Design a protein with these regions (language model features):
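Beta-propeller domains with acidic blade repeats across secreted/periplasmic ectodomains
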Residues: 1-171
Length: 171
């Protein structure tokens, strides 16, 4: 699966063809209607795919799934999307919808200024992100989960048998 955070055209804001920043699920043969100015295809055209989620005004800098985080399950399954200009990191909660997804964005981190430039999850399960760009002060931030420790999922019988075989092979 491929997801992206598509930018808007700021100078189109307030015009009938303005399209907000949006989360896209890229599918084979998908048409997302990117055109310049008033030539943009609206998402209701039969051959144009809609966004998984509309975000609004912003300046997208990237996306990352929370699968490597130590966050609760809700956020492990979320797509995190960074907005440089408004200083936000969204957690987009995706639900299957036919061959694609529909997403519900939630502001996960917000600050002023917080010009988010990049993000990753460390081996410790924390979210690390950096700020900076265009001559602004850079920074490195760490977001951790400070709640009840997550329980390890129970292993299937086949996983337990495979582990036992590996252990015997090492002995």
């Amino acid at each position: 699966e491929i997801f992206g955070f598509d930018s808007d055209m700021e100078w189109d804001w307030g015009l009938p063809w303005y399209r907000p920043t949006r989360i896209l699920h890229a599918v084979i043969g998908g048409e997302y209607g990117w055109r310049s100015g008033s030539g943009k295809f609206p998402s209701y055209y039969a051959d144009t795919l809609p966004a998984a989620a509309d975000i609004g005004l912003g300046s997208p800098t990237g996306v990352k799934f929370g699968t490597k985080s130590n966050f609760p399950e809700k956020y492990k399954n979320a797509l995190f999307a960074m907005d440089w200009s408004y200083g936000r990191i969204f957690a987009v909660h995706l639900q299957p919808d036919g061959a694609t997804y529909q997403g519900t964005p939630e502001v996960f981190v917000k600050g002023k200024p917080l010009n988010v430039a990049d993000m990753d999850f460390g081996k410790d399960g924390a979210m690390y992100f950096i700020t900076g760009g265009r001559g602004t002060q850079s920074g490195l931030y760490r977001v951790t989960y400070d709640g009840e420790k997550m329980k390890e999922p129970k292993k299937s019988d086949s996983e337990l048998v495979a582990e036992k075989k590996k252990k015997k092979a090492r002995e």
